[in-house]
Each structure stands twice: as C-alpha cells, then as structure tokens.
C-alpha cells in the first residue's frame, strides 16, 4: 500500500513479501535504489519480508519535483524473484502503465501538451493491495487540448488491455482567455500598483475558481 491523498505524490509505500529474506532481497533493493532514487528499508517478520519505500512527496500538479514511492515499490517488486501468480502479474501490469519517472502519462497513452497550458502531468497517488484484488488512484492535470476521447477513453483502453476496470469522471480543463475584460482589468491594476509587467500564468493546480466560468485565480505575487 502507499499514499495518503490523491493530490499528493506519495512519499512512502510498503508491502509484505512472503518467502523472501532480507539478504536475498538486498542486492535487488540496492540496484532499484540507484535506478529510482527511492530508499528501501527491509525488516524480516517471521517468514515474510516487510519492505518500506521512502521517496519524496510533492504536489500532484508538480510530480517531477518529487520521487514517487509507489512506482518505486512497483519497480522493485518487478525485479524480485517472486512466484508468477495473479497478484504479481497485476503488479507488473501496473508498473508497465505507471513506470517510475513517467510523469507525463506516456505509458498510459495520454501524454499531450499545448502552447497555452503546457504538458499533461500524472501522479500515481494511492494504491492498496489485499487478498482479493487491488485498487489505485491517480491524479492527472490536463492541458486545454485534453478531452474525453484523447484522455479518459485513451486511459481506459490502456487499462483494459491488462484487465483493469476504471471508475471516476474527468473534469474538463479550465481556461479564461488573456484578452477577457476581467483579465485585462486585473493586469492593469497589477501593473498600476506594482510597476511590474503583468502576465497570465497557466498552472496545474485547480484553485477554487475552476468551476466559475470566465474566472481566474488572482492575488498578490511579486516576480
């Protein structure tokens, strides 16, 4: 399991592996640590091995600023000499869809960008695995060019290839033109009182204005 909020890149993830000793796993952990930047801590519990992965948390809109502990754990598990059963096959499939370091959704088939709002970002944020199955959640901040066909439907098609079902809806990206009367008035006030040139910014964070048509997030910010 790993993660604690969908909008936070998971800083920690853990698992319990049966029939594996710390000595046997350590070389794989050392190799995976060098490849991912994740730190792996091992503790034997009877006949099982507890693995704790420590990455670096970040906001889901800026996944490149962190180190995803969930994808780091999947990366390690795919390298371990584990039995070829349904659960390990599912974890390998997840790692193929969310390879460590892929913050743009390339493997999921949804990578895209546009000049106004930049590139899509993707963070695999939550994962729970138990004896009956697994459940995960990911957070994606999409550019203006994203729509149901090239984003949600494309992701569902990728998941279905591995037998995963998908639930949840896609929120359309929010955009207000820079030449709207509201934006022009706000920039004029900013420039008048700061003597700095005002410019519009596109960010991955939703902000509370997301559901207000024609609205923008605005506040005091110096260059």
At which residue positions do the language-model features occur?
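Ordered, soluble secondary-structure elements with a strong preference for glycine-centered loop motifs
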Residues: 63-64, 146-149, 177
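Zn-dependent metallopeptidase/amidohydrolase metal-coordination segment
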Residues: 130, 184-223
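Short linear capping/connector segments at secondary-structure termini
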Residues: 166-172
């Amino acid at each position: 399991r790993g993660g604690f909020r969908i909008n936070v890149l998971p800083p920690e993830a853990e698992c319990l592996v049966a029939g594996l000793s710390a000595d046997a796993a350590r070389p794989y952990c050392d190799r995976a640590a060098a490849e991912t930047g994740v730190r792996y801590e091992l503790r034997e519990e009877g006949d099982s091995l507890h693995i704790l992965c420590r990455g670096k948390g970040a906001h889901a809109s800026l996944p490149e600023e962190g180190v995803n502990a969930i994808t780091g754990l999947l990366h390690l598990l795919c390298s371990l000499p584990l039995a070829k059963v349904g659960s390990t096959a599912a974890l390998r499939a997840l790692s193929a869809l969310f390879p460590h370091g892929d913050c743009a959704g390339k493997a999921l088939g949804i990578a895209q960008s546009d000049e106004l709002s930049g590139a899509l970002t993707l963070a695999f944020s939550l994962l729970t695995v138990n004896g009956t199955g697994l459940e995960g959640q990911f957070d994606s901040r999409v550019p203006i060019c994203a729509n149901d066909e090239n984003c949600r439907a494309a992701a569902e098609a990728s998941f279905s290839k591995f037998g995963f079902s998908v639930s949840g809806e896609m929120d359309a990206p929010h955009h207000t033109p820079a030449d709207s009367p509201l934006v022009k008035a706000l920039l004029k006030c900013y420039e008048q009182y700061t003597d700095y040139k005002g410019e519009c910014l596109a960010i991955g964070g939703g902000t509370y204005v997301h559901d207000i048509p024609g609205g923008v997030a605005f506040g005091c910010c110096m260059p």
